[in-house]
Amino acid sequence: KPELRYKAARQGLQELGHETTLSYLGEAARLVFEESDLLPHLNPGLMTAEDFQALRPVSASMGIMLESVSDRLMEKGEAHHGSPDKIPARRLETLRLAGEATVPFTSGLLIGIGETRLERVESLLALRRLHDEHGHIQEVIIQNFRAKPETKMAAALEPDLEELLWTIAVARILFGPEMSIQAPPNLSPGVLTRIVEAGINDWGGVSPLTPDFVNPEAPWPHLDHLARETEEAGKLLIERLTVYPRYALEGE
């Protein structure tokens, strides 16, 4: 968490009347939940059982990307080296606690960061086991890595389309027709029909108002264009809430 590493973050939080980022997030989510027509979706990273207990009443859903279960990626020179919050066991524990707290949850894989196809299958199976036990995973994202300037992986090769399509297809096979499988449309322009044909049924959050803050170099497709591409693949583009219907009906 930022307050554990940066003095400026601690000072900023204190000025806002909070000791932790998650406390501040909880207040912001409560204001959105109570004073607007929006439903908060929270993605604050690793969480404890107490964190879920505090945030569940002020959010409709939450999420954390598993990315990969490969401990090998934590080694020096690999994508997750020096990132303790990306230790697979810690992310899996957050996913497990989300299930125990009955939080409608989003997770998924980041492909093309040095993992093998076998490691992708192992990651998908880990998510499947957690979902089989708790039934809380609403959607599984298959996100392709995009290299960013001025980062340690700026020169890293990005995964090709076939790797993305293969992983989507395997996710659909492993999770069956009931699970929502998602891929960001702004990261694969020009091939959206092939992505649908591979097995997705959801584009995720696509905003006409804000950029993709994680991938600002990749603008969202215009909704009219996305609707046409979706129709060409034999599907319809419709809006949905951050919480899926059956989870909304099961909510307290």
Regions found by a protein language model. Name each.
Residues 1-132:
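Conserved Radical SAM active-site core
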Residues 11, 31-36, 121-252:
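Auxiliary Fe-S-binding modules of radical SAM enzymes
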